Amino acid sequence: MTDLSHIRNFSIIAHIDHGKSTIADRFIQICGGLSDREMEAQVLDSMDLERERGITIKAHSVTLNYKARDGKTYQLNFIDTPGHVDFTYEVSRSLAACEGALLVVDAAQGVEAQSVANCYTAIEQGLEVIPVLNKMDLPQAEPDRVAQEIEDIIGLDATEAVRCSAKSGLGMEDVLEELVRLVPPPTGDVGAPLQALIIDSWFDNYLGVVSLVRVVQGTLRLKDKIIAKTIGKSQLVDGLGVFTPKPLQLKELKAGEVGFVVAGIKDIHGAPVGDTITHAQTPDVEALAGFQKIKPQVYAGMFPVSSDDFESFREALAKLTLNDASLFYEPESSDALGFGFRCGFLGMLHMEIIQERLEREYDLDLITTAPTVVYEIETAKGETIFVDNPSKLPDPGSINEMREPIVEANILVPQEHLGNVITLCVEKRGVQKDLQFTGSQVAVRYELPMNEVVTDFFDRLKSVSRGFASLDYNFLRFQPAKLVRLDVLINGDKVDALALIVHRDKSQHMGRQLVEKMKDLIPRQMFDVAIQAAIGGQVVARSTVKALRKDVLAKCYGGDATRKKKLLEKQKAGKKRMKQVGNVEIPQAAFFAVLKIDS
């Protein structure tokens, strides 16, 4: 095995679409990790969803052997990281296992807010950051301008930055040479008691829990007895190895290496991410500093369409939580939708991804309510409570003060789109804190209510800036605000799953818009359906879905039986997506109407 001075652990920091996964592909090709026949684009993005959306969601790892120009062979452990703002937690975990990071910037587009945020995380964790200018093959590449931008915005000297094109393969070996030269080797003692950090875990139906670990001290061998510090239950190591990117079984993993461990753990919570693994005979080894547990920012109710799926839904969530430590869930029941779970997510993209993974990987049919953020409420008795579900909001009389979460949003935008972005932030009740011109870009800092950010802010920001603005935000504080609960009544019955918490100044406008939207989405019945929006006891908007006249002539006379069967099946599939609320069927689209309101 390689000695410590020849190991390099690194990850790549890049904004979405700046070519991170393609660089990974080139590294694998240069180092011969896969034969040309097995090579495919974005080989590390193994989830179908990742390929379809063209984003990296999960962190992946690869171990490659690179023969450098100095004639020595180096073991490169590369941990791939996602670039989207919702997955920053995955990034901080990957960085915790590295000594260096490549900051990849698109030579045509320049620096984006997300790379700035992740780059600061890397610098705070003491990593060596190496700037790389990618996409040099593009005619619109401006390396000198972008190098200056990296220096202005992040403060890294990028005059010597490697210039490469992952697509054409130009300059990729120079990137590897820089990596070997600049990233420090890991420190650690192979003979010390074992300490290994769990970077990621996932559930395999045959092997049980598989964990990706970075060995910090000591050596991990096959048939060793190991324990996870927080659980303390001893397990036998059945298999360990590295991904090249195919799994390669090894006899041992030494200090400084990154690889996977299988220890026959069948319990989903048997290997929590961020925990320390050590030998059963040295249980009092110091735990490694993991990463802070992240708090969900957005909550939504998820309910199985058929109540028979409740147990399989619970299992699916448990397996997903193992793989995605930032997902939170607790049981919840709704008068309208029955039993389900209240789930917490890092942002809207995270929520969509989780919903799609549940529906695809676990074959569940789900109804999701509109997402809300967490509010802090001081009751008349002086107690402080947190509410993440509008239907759990106490009676207005017993509330002393309501506070909403405020986020600090850092936006990078080209100068010509600055006006539109400022207009959007003001419309979303934002307060400008800072504005700096750096080259052709402007860095704006705003304080915005999180409630406004999580719904459609990201999409609107992209559309007003023609896709050029980038956003990074983090929670700042709770701030008092005039908030009210907007209830939706259908035929006089409150539908708890449709309630919203909104700002008082916007409540009437929101009520009217919501009612109009619902009117278009609720199918016509055999009777008039009244849709009302109310605040407390006061109705602020009303609309009526007119009754339908039954068409008695549209019956099939005789004809082919399979034709009738087809029509019945089609109707059955449509009914499945609906839920009976009192006596009106509400389609899934109506639950999401809330998101489409122009506040």
From Swiss-Prot:
The keyword Magnesium does not apply. Its EC number is 3.6.5.n1. Keywords: Cell inner membrane, Cell membrane, GTP-binding, Hydrolase, Membrane, Nucleotide-binding, Protein biosynthesis. GO terms for molecular function: GTP binding; GTPase activity; guanosine tetraphosphate binding; ribosome binding; translation elongation factor activity. It is found in: Cell inner membrane. Residues 5-187 form the tr-type G domain. The keyword tRNA processing does not apply. InterPro entries: EF-4, EFG_III/V, EFG_V-like, LepA_C_sf, LepA_CTD, LepA_IV, P-loop_NTPase, Small_GTP-bd. GO terms for cellular component: plasma membrane. It catalyses: GTP + H2O = GDP + phosphate + H(+). It is an enzyme of class 3 (hydrolase). CDD domains: EF4_II (cd03699), EF4_III (cd16260), LepA (cd01890), lepA_C (cd03709). Gene3D superfamilies: 3.30.70.240, Elongation factor 4, C-terminal domain, Elongation Factor G (Translational Gtpase), domain 3, P-loop containing nucleotide triphosphate hydrolases, Translation factors. Signal peptide: none annotated. Required for accurate and efficient protein synthesis under certain stress conditions. May act as a fidelity factor of the translation reaction, by catalyzing a one-codon backward translocation of tRNAs on improperly translocated ribosomes. Back-translocation proceeds from a post-translocation (POST) complex to a pre-translocation (PRE) complex, thus giving elongation factor G a second chance to translocate the tRNAs correctly. Binds to ribosomes in a GTP-dependent manner. This is Elongation factor 4. It comes from Cellvibrio japonicus (strain Ueda107) (Pseudomonas fluorescens subsp. cellulosa).
